[in-house]
Amino acid sequence: MAKFQAPVINDNALGWGPCAIPDQFKDMPYQPFSKGDRLGKVADWTGATYQDKRYTNKYSSQFGGGSQYAYFHDEDETSFQLVDTTKMQKTAYQRNRMRFAQRNLRRDKDRRNMLQFNMQTLPKSAKQKERDRLRLQKKFQKQFGVRQKWDQRSQAQLKPRDSSVEVRSDWEVKEEMDFPRLMKMRYMEVADPTDIECCGAVEYYDKAFDRITTRNERPLRSIKRIFHTVTTTDDPVIRKLAKTQGNVFATDAILATLMCCTRSVNSWDIVVQRVGSKIFFDKRDNSDFDLLTVSETANEPPQDEVNSLNSPRNLAMEATYINHNFSQQCLRMGKEKHTFPNPNPFIEDDVDKNEVASVAYRYRRWKLGDDIDLVVRCEHDGVMTGANGEVSFINIKTLNEWDSKYCNGVDWRQKLDSQRGAVIATELKNNSYKLARWTCCALLAGSEYLKLGYVSRYNVKDSTRHVVLGTQQFKPNEFANQINLSMENAWGILRCVVDICMKLDEGKYLILKDPNKQVIRIYSLPDGTFSSDEEEDDDDEDEEVEEEES
């Protein structure tokens, strides 16, 4: 007979629920689970992922999050291989980076949504007004030369530079050479020069100027001496030499202008006279050829008005004045001189020799191939005595500081003693053409040293008083390498210009550097251009006009 068997009831008198675990459920793991969970799964591909970690813990399901039912492999098998899926602990920087990236994504999304909303609600009239405003803005920017850079700063438009001489309508262009083509020129078959004649006398350098620093600066004195800047055809020595030797004649300053022309920015001109089979390179009378430019190759060269203290011409006249005075002040004036065999050819009989600047002239000859016989008048500014008493010829030039706030300048009074390399690097950037010409002249003359003086204004707003802050000495060959001046390229440019001039007919020509382009042009000039007779006729006409007006 069937018998009812009463179940065992666990009575929990102190609480709710069973007081003991049945035997069949002992040691059984438990976790919240869902019927959709797979027991013993290797990887969880069903869980929902959130890109934004802020909402992960709030809205994600906790079912299947435990590891009680996960599969753990006890023994290694050859059929498959376990993969380490543990996550690397992120640094605080990585966590913050992800947080900022998510925030930026939300902002971009909100901005796009707002822009889309505005475009949807913008009426046609407002759209048309916005288009008109943008169109006018672009038009004004093109008209006034305003260009917005990435940092929203407008760069001032450079003024167009003036030509060194006005090109007339009856001048004909014979040749045009651009700088990129000239930079590729090379000529290496240059023989060593031979000295034809040496003239003049030079004074000895005062080594006390080598001890000048910014703490014991020395005032620059105004020295009244005569400087002769005679052009090629007016040189009596070159006229004498042209009868017997040479077919190309020039001065070192004119040749250096041509040989380093690819660094020039401002306009300059050289007169070429073809007489028979000979060529003479000249400079125009009363031109600015001998004025020293200031910050010519700077990114933002001086562009003040003509009457301003810092206008390009006033700065050039100031630099020339400083260079002349320093080149004489740093010598032992009135004392022993180093004299060449021949006297100075430019001193007149009624002029005191002590009133003439210390300059010696060396006439040298180069053979450029079989057909070019070059004769050049070179200059020395002084001499030095070495430790063993040997004599070294030097060229003395001056760098001047006018205002360190412009042209990315460096304050010389603070940096010249401690960071002289930074000063010369800045000057090389702002005056690359001038330094290259000086170096080329020193190499042509065969000077052993190039002396550079650093002269600054006593007051920034006063261009009449200056002080010497220091000096520096270079060997021309080493300095040419430092400033990346290739003499092979310089001789190549000169040979190219000479070959072109040799193909021209007899007459007068002009080599002109374009004021706003990297181009030099050769013009043929009518008879009488730049002659003294033409200037006298112009003066007579001016006098007649003044008499009629009076």
Swiss-Prot record:
InterPro entries: eIF3d. Residues 288-302 are annotated as: RNA gate. GO terms for biological process: cap-dependent translational initiation; formation of cytoplasmic translation initiation complex; translational initiation. Pfam families: eIF-3_zeta (PF05091). Keywords: Cytoplasm, Initiation factor, Protein biosynthesis, RNA-binding. The keyword Transmembrane helix does not apply. GO terms for molecular function: mRNA cap binding; RNA binding; translation initiation factor activity. The keyword Cytoplasm applies. Disulfide bonds: none annotated. Residues 532-550 have a biased composition (Acidic residues). GO terms for cellular component: eukaryotic 43S preinitiation complex; eukaryotic 48S preinitiation complex; eukaryotic translation initiation factor 3 complex. Residues 526-550 are annotated as: Disordered. Transmembrane segments: none annotated. It is found in: Cytoplasm. Belongs to the eIF-3 subunit D family. Component of the eukaryotic translation initiation factor 3 (eIF-3) complex, which is composed of 13 subunits: eif3a, eif3b, eif3c, eif3d, eif3e, eif3f, eif3g, eif3h, eif3i, eif3j, eif3k, eif3l and eif3m. mRNA cap-binding component of the eukaryotic translation initiation factor 3 (eIF-3) complex, which is involved in protein synthesis of a specialized repertoire of mRNAs and, together with other initiation factors, stimulates binding of mRNA and methionyl-tRNAi to the 40S ribosome. The eIF-3 complex specifically targets and initiates translation of a subset of mRNAs involved in cell proliferation. In the eIF-3 complex, eif3d specifically recognizes and binds the 7-methylguanosine cap of a subset of mRNAs. The RNA gate region regulates mRNA cap recognition to prevent promiscuous mRNA-binding before assembly of eif3d into the full eukaryotic translation initiation factor 3 (eIF-3) complex. HAMAP family: eIF3d. This is Eukaryotic translation initiation factor 3 subunit D. It comes from Xenopus laevis (African clawed frog).
